[in-house]
């Protein structure tokens, strides 16, 4: 609901069975949404209930004799998932411009369908009404996303063996910010590690209440490029279609990440260190696919076969990674046998059986490929002076920093096969599917043991009466 409006949706296609080799990262079919690209009258819609208020307006324009269409629409949504809890509510604004242009020539036709979209989800400064210090505790979040797409489609009416050539490209930029202010009340004097370098350093005590400011800033950018060709041959009792292509995906976050004061963390148990999202390398995937679809007419029976394969490769990584530049092949296959129609009460009853097998490769995400550095803060001295805690207390820490990156990560491979039976009669369909899915690998974090050396200072040896400042380590 935060990013998608239903007013500009023309059709929704649900593809069952093992997905085509054209699509990656899918195991159980696909939902394909097409947006309106045609002349439409000016429409406005308003909806209000106990959970939301929605207003949208849109219109489609066409230029006669020029094969040109322009669709413009926008909307506003005020969502209240729980009207009693304003922390769960949000507002969304969306705007979309879509163009469709057709060029006709003797040997070819080209359709150009670009679009520009904006979505913004924003929340005003909010407080928890159940807190007595609500004037201090507050947060504000904002989400803004703009995207551009360019789609080209060529058809060749005079060529029997080549059907279409498609070239699709898109780029999107997003800004996602969360600002939070929180009153922290430590139950006791707590240590806040502040060192960003390995070695010995003094930490900071959290003695009393303080106000923590926190910012999470994300600016992800995504790019996509895909080229595809479709081919076909037909005979008296068969039809063969084939398609081949490739695609490239790029994802990079240019945000500041988590920004906060190490000496005043958002939680007294916080032990991590800030890391800019922009320091994390981009994620790039390169894929190619090849697939054939065959239809055979066997008397009054019909047999459809779909066989294909898809390769998936992660690129742009360090050579230390096992995944870098290594292709993984995903085979996909589907078959369907349709029996002759059976007349029942003057109507046709259709029965078919289907089956399929497919492999899907799931690459690790950024948090597994580029995890945060692990900080091990060991307290060597924890001296708290009861008389002058601010002036004479001292906490000494040795910090170890470990790179926990696993350069030998392998992708997860999901194997699935299924068998399905379908019965349809007068627009009604009964479908029964049995499937078996086998995923024996995946990604998770695990602990490890390692020795660390440190000094243990005996704070009982400190002579509190003779202190003129924090105790010196040399005297303990």
At which residue positions do the language-model features occur?
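Short acidic/polar hinge/loop motifs at secondary-structure boundaries
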Residues: 1-16
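Structural signature of Gram-negative outer-membrane beta-barrels, strongest in the C-terminal barrel
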Residues: 279-429, 433-437
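Transmembrane beta-barrel wall of Gram-negative outer-membrane proteins
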Residues: 43-78, 85-167
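Face-selective signature of the C-terminal outer-membrane beta-barrel domain
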Residues: 101-121, 139-320
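Transmembrane beta-strands of outer-membrane beta-barrel pores
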Residues: 48-52, 63, 74-80, 116-124, ...
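N-terminal periplasmic accessory domains that precede
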Residues: 1-2, 22-45
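Surface-exposed loop/turn segments flanking beta-strands in extracellular/periplasmic regions
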Residues: 186-208, 252-276, 373-403, 450-472
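Outer membrane beta-barrel strand-and-loop segments of large Gram-negative receptors
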Residues: 224, 410, 429-476
């Amino acid at each position: 609901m935060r990013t998608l409006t239903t007013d500009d949706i023309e059709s929704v296609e649900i593809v069952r069975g093992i997905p085509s080799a054209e699509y990656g990262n899918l195991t159980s079919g696909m939902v394909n949404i097409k947006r309106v690209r045609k002349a439409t009258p000016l429409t406005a819609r308003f909806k209000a209930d106990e959970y939301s208020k929605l207003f949208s307006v849109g219109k489609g324009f066409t230029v006669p004799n020029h094969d040109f269409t322009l669709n413009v629409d926008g909307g506003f949504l005020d969502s209240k998932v729980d009207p009693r809890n304003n922390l769960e509510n949000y507002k969304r604004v969306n705007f979309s411009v879509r163009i469709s242009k057709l060029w006709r020539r003797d040997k070819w036709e080209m359709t150009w369908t670009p679009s520009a979209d904006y979505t913004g989800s924003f929340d005003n400064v909010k407080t928890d009404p159940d807190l007595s210090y609500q004037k201090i505790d507050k947060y504000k979040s904002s989400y803004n996303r703009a995207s551009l797409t360019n789609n080209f489609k060529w058809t060749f009416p005079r060529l029997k063996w080549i059907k279409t050539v498609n070239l699709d490209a898109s780029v999107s930029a997003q800004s996602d910010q969360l600002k939070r202010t929180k009153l922290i009340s430590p139950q006791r004097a707590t240590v806040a590690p502040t060192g960003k370098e390995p070695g010995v350093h003094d930490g900071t005590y959290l003695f009393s209440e303080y106000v923590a400011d926190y910012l999470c800033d994300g600016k992800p950018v995504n790019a996509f490029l895909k080229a595809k060709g479709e081919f076909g041959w037909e005979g008296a009792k068969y039809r063969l279609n084939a398609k081949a292509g490739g695609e490239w995906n790029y994802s990079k976050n240019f945000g500041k990440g988590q920004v906060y004061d190490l000496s005043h963390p958002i939680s007294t148990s916080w032990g991590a260190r800030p890391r800019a999202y922009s320091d994390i390398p981009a994620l790039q995937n390169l894929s190619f696919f090849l697939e054939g679809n065959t239809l055979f007419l066997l008397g009054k029976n019909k047999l459809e076969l779909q066989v294909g394969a898809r390769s998936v490769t992660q690129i742009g990584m360090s050579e230390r990674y096992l995944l870098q530049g290594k292709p993984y092949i995903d085979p996909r296959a589907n078959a369907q046998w349709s029996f002759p129609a059976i007349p029942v009460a003057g109507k046709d009853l259709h029965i078919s059986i289907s089956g399929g097998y497919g492999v899907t490769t799931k690459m690790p995400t950024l948090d597994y490929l580029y995890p945060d550095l692990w900080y091990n803060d060991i307290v060597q001295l924890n001296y708290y002076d009861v008389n002058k805690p601010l002036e004479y207390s001292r906490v000494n820490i040795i910090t170890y920093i470990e790179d926990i990156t696993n350069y030998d990560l392998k992708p997860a491979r999901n194997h699935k096969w299924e068998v399905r039976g379908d019965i349809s009669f007068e627009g009604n369909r009964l479908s029964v599917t049995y499937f078996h899915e086998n995923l024996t690998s995946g990604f998770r974090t695990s602990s490890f043991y390692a020795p660390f050396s440190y000094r243990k200072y005996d704070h009982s040896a400190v002579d509190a009466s003779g202190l003129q400042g924090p105790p010196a380590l040399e005297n303990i």
